[in-house]
Swiss-Prot record:
Species per Swiss-Prot/TrEMBL record: Acaryochloris marina (strain MBIC 11017)
Pfam families hit by this protein: Ribosomal_L22 (PF00237)
Domain of life: Bacteria
Record-linked CDD domains: Ribosomal_L22
Descriptive protein name: Large ribosomal subunit protein uL22
Subunit description: Part of the 50S ribosomal subunit.
This protein's GO CC annotations: cytosolic large ribosomal subunit
Alphabetical list of NCBIfam families matching this protein: rplV_bact (TIGR01044)
Length: 120
């Protein structure tokens, strides 16, 4: 998908190794995909999920990349691609009764957001 992102008329940003479940991040990304930059900002500001903070940070970075590298106006930008891939799992151990230990897996994810100029 990365080669496809480089071909779009816009910019993208990534955040890697975010200590959050990709499933929970996708719930937020599904709400902003296809929306304009301003709408996406408003939606992310008022959603009650913990995943909104890193998604908002990546979205702002993608828009800054579009402004700086491509010279695009933020008013015309639309979230064209937004997805979360699974990252490596952090493995931890929790002590249990009678000297045993259970393995706890803490998920991570990689967030990618691409913005492109609106076709109007």
């Amino acid at each position: 998908m990365t080669t496809q992102l480089k071909d779009i008329n816009g910019a993208y940003a990534k955040a890697k190794y975010i200590r959050m479940s990709p499933r929970k991040v996708r719930r937020v990304l599904d709400q902003i995909r296809g929306r304009s930059y301003r709408e996406a900002l408003i939606v992310l500001e008022f959603m009650p999920y913990r995943a909104c903070e890193p998604v908002l940070k990546v979205l702002r970075s993608a828009v800054a990349n579009a402004e700086t590298n491509r010279g695009l106006d933020p008013v015309d930008l639309v979230v064209s691609h937004a997805y979360a891939d699974q990252g490596p799992r952090l493995k931890r151990f929790r002590p249990r009764a009678q000297g045993r230990a259970y393995q706890i897996q803490k998920p991570t994810c990689h967030i990618t957001i691409a913005v492109s100029a609106e076709a109007s």
